[in-house]
Amino acid sequence: MGRLLEVREFDRIICNAEYSGDTKYKYLEEKEFRNLVKFIRSIPGNAMDADILDFMRIDYRRNVGDVVSVKNYVGVIQLPDGFQIQVLPKISLGEEDENYARTKKVFLRMLSSLKKFPEKVFQEASLKADRMNLYELFVNMYLQEVRRLVKKGIKSDYVEQEDNLSFYKGKLLVNKHLQMNLVHQERFFVAFQEFHPNRAENRIIKATLLKLQKLTNSVDNAKEILKLLTAFEMVDKSVNYTKDFAGIVSNRNTRDYEMLMQWSKVFLLNKNFTTFSGDTAAQSLLFPMELVYESYVAQQMKKVMSPAGWQVSSQEKKKYLFDNSKSFALKPDIVMKRDGRIVILDTKWKELDGKENGSNYGISQADMYQMYAYSKKYGTSEIWLLYPINDAVRKEGNREPVKFVSEDKNSKTEVNVYFVDLDKIEESLEILKARLEE
């Protein structure tokens, strides 16, 4: 599988060989560790939607040295020398997870809710999770989508051509004709249009396939790339990515290319699903887990609750904290309505404490203020915070529901905390549904 380090969120990476056997840390050799630190420091701290401090933090521990902590983003970082660091989400499964195969399967299911590829592509990739690392799974999904396009037939278009022909067609290019054919008056240097597959979209795909051919360490992926390249024999490799991406045509005829063009940008231009764009030669393919978790839970809630007559909407932006100036929009993750009843659910990709311990289970004060604002502005007492279940909570087994209640003369706010089991999401949300309908 090549040179890689596979870690989970909240793992701590070090380069001190004396602690290489310590289970509290993930050990990385000095050269790769310094390249990783360089990558982190090259990312602008003022990135619009993603602060590097939410992803990787560099700390110093006495005796241990520099420590890199990982959180909130999942995916792949490829360092300049080809070494890969693959970050997987910390998902509680309740049992051993050899090679993180089940974690990868759950993560792919979650990722499918973002519609970056058709669901079938994620399902097929999931079958290979036990023998492919995360990067190879992403490559495999891209190849599946190319295969789907090839089966339907790659599109041709009228392409501008120039050539010195023995017959006349199109438009004579006078200057070039005089240069080339002063002693060959039987020939014509002309410009003409030809219906041909050598269009921008196909050139981009061919360039991506050739790049992935060099990068992949998977025998399965390498074989698939060879097969697919035969379908692009009449297509040139893109040599000017910017020009070809600008030349993409978006219409009904090219709908099958849309996802492939997005992912080709990821592989060719290092255009990420985050705003991270470091100045080093390192490349990254990263997904914000807060967004992935929110999208997945919202998708699954619609499946579970809609048949029971609930109207479920996500990221609803209809209320403001200050109505007169329409400022500070309130956007709860999920709003459910039925027969005049309103329930607000907000997802939080955070690891709560298993016990209260005087710290409110680790729930932030800012989150509670936010829930209180939702309650007042939406005129409902029913507020739910949805956290992923973790090992500490799982160990406690059956427990009293966690809730916080605030009452005054005219209204009541009840914030309920629920732990979602991502490995058994349907079963977990059915239990939540039963609690909502008690």
Regions found by a protein language model. Name each.
Residues 2-277, 283:
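Residue(s) in the substrate-gating loop at a strand-loop-helix junction
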Residues 1-47, 277-438:
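Catalytic core segments in nucleotide and nucleic-acid processing enzymes
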